[in-house]
Swiss-Prot record:
GO terms for biological process: division septum assembly; sporulation resulting in formation of a cellular spore. It comes from the Bacteria. Keywords: Cell cycle, Cell division, Septation. Could be involved in septation. This is Putative septation protein SpoVG. Gene3D superfamilies: Stage V sporulation protein G (3.30.1120.40). Belongs to the SpoVG family. Pfam families: SpoVG.
Amino acid sequence: MKVTDVRIRKVAAEGKMKAIVSVTFDEEFVVHDIKIIEGQNGLFIAMPSRKMGEGDFRDIAHPINSDTRSKIQDAIFAEYAIMNEEVQVQVQVTEEAL
């Protein structure tokens, strides 16, 4: 299975949740609501989940092995880095215009 598209919706700069992502596989299947979260050891992805009860969350969709998780995470972080670069360029252009 190959990641064929990553779409990122930026969330507010402050807070632990940095973005919400949709990932398309083989141009045939999409998983929405993957979150990019900043933890104590850096950024990580959280698969879409549903609250089950007293603070328990259960993944709705998730990779079955660590290799697949790494492929998904690498594709998401690569697109997130590109998006952050574009935002930085826009901020610099705006600041220079002022």
